[in-house]
Regions:
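A short, structured surface patch at a secondary-structure boundary
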Residues: 33-88
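Proline-aspartate-enriched helix->loop->beta-strand connector
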Residues: 86-89, 93-99, 116, 226, ...
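Structured C-terminal subdomain patch of bacterial secreted/periplasmic proteins
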Residues: 137, 229-298
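Extracytoplasmic ligand-binding site segments that recognize negatively charged/polar headgroups
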Residues: 50-59, 104-106, 121-134, 170-196, ...
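Basic- and aromatic-lined ligand-binding clefts that recognize polyanionic substrates
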Residues: 24, 32-36, 146-208
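Extracytoplasmic substrate-binding proteins
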Residues: 15, 106-181, 275-298
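Short, low-complexity disordered leader/linker segments with a strong preference
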Residues: 1-18, 298
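Short helix-initiation/N-cap motifs at beta->coil->alpha
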Residues: 13, 77-86, 212-222
Length: 298
């Protein structure tokens, strides 16, 4: 940690003060790993994809993470009730810990005893732009933060120009969990996941926005409620199943998006790229669904 300046970051756990410029940063969550890489800052330790990633626990767009960055025990993201690797994090002697993509901050509160810890700002997915702005302040590199955000917006602006017919159309991000027979749908237009679609001219259907059942930016429904997926574009992960399994669900083939070529059945990495977006992951995932974007736009 160098310098004496102090930056205060408001989080769901209260304000976090970071004094000086941190140099040993632990990133818990794919969004923060990606944000650091945008600043050419390597995490000393990280949790990202866990068992859903490659041999280093990384997603396909995270190729620039250095070989000497330590992959931490990912039990907390791989298992319900998995332990946070507190001792492992402490052994790295971090001067800043970044946490995102967690269902509850309670198991992570003890990290603040190790180093200043930046938790999410609210109980929904933070936008990648907000995280870049936060890092810009903490690293005393606000000009770089503005440049990174402009670069990201240039990518989505280009996609919007490629498909002008998307303007005014609707989109939903969802997953069907076969083990529990539950449908999870992003319904809050202010959620970071929904804002990826918003950046290319798409909106969340108003019927979902008005739902009283939104929690953490999402609605969880039974399979009989597939009818809520009225959007022109439906991006869905068959969690624990296949596209063929989805097509067997009553009502799936009758979705408006199905007849219009707007159903994108995607893999885990692609849905994560939307669900907890970063500049890099949003570009990766949007490129994966270009055929559906073209169909919806036409």
């Amino acid at each position: 940690m160098s310098g004496s300046r102090t930056v205060t970051v408001d989080t769901i756990a209260g304000p976090t003060e970071v004094t000086g410029t941190p140099s040993r940063i632990v990133a818990f969550g794919q969004q923060w790993v990606d944000a650091l890489i945008e600043f050419d800052v390597q995490p000393v330790g990280y949790v990202s994809a866990g068992s859903n990633g490659d041999e280093r626990g990384l997603y396909p767009w995270q190729t620039e993470v250095a070989d000497d960055s330590i992959m931490l025990d990912a039990s907390a993201v791989d298992q319900v009730g998995g332990a946070v690797p507190t001792e492992q994090i402490a052994s790295l002697q971090p001067d800043l810990i970044l946490v995102s993509g967690i269902p509850s901050i309670d198991p992570y509160r003890g990290l603040s005893d190790i180093a200043p810890t930046i938790f999410p700002k609210a109980e929904k997915v933070e936008t990648w732009e907000s995280q870049i702005e936060t890092l810009g302040r903490v690293l005393d590199r606000e000009d770089d933060a503005s440049r990174i955000i402009e670069e990201g917006h240039a990518v989505t602006d280009d996609i919007e120009q490629d498909y002008p017919g998307l303007d005014g159309k609707t989109a939903v991000l969802s997953q069907f969990v076969f083990d529990t027979q539950q449908l999870a749908v992003v319904a809050d237009p202010e959620d970071g996941a929904a804002q990826v679609f918003g950046s290319i001219g798409l909106t969340v259907p108003q019927s979902l926005v008005d739902s009283p059942d939104i929690s953490h930016g999402r609605i969880v429904l039974s399979p009989e409620r597939l009818d809520v997926l009225t959007a022109d574009l439906v991006v869905m992960l068959p969690n624990g199943g296949t596209r063929e399994d989805l097509e067997k669900l009553p009502g799936f083939s009758g979705l408006p998006a199905a007849s219009g070529g707007g159903v994108a059945v995607v893999d885990f990495a692609t849905v994560v790229g939307f669900n907890t977006p970063s500049k890099a992951s949003a570009e990766y995932s949007l490129n994966k669904i270009r055929p559906q974007l073209e169909a919806v736009a036409s």
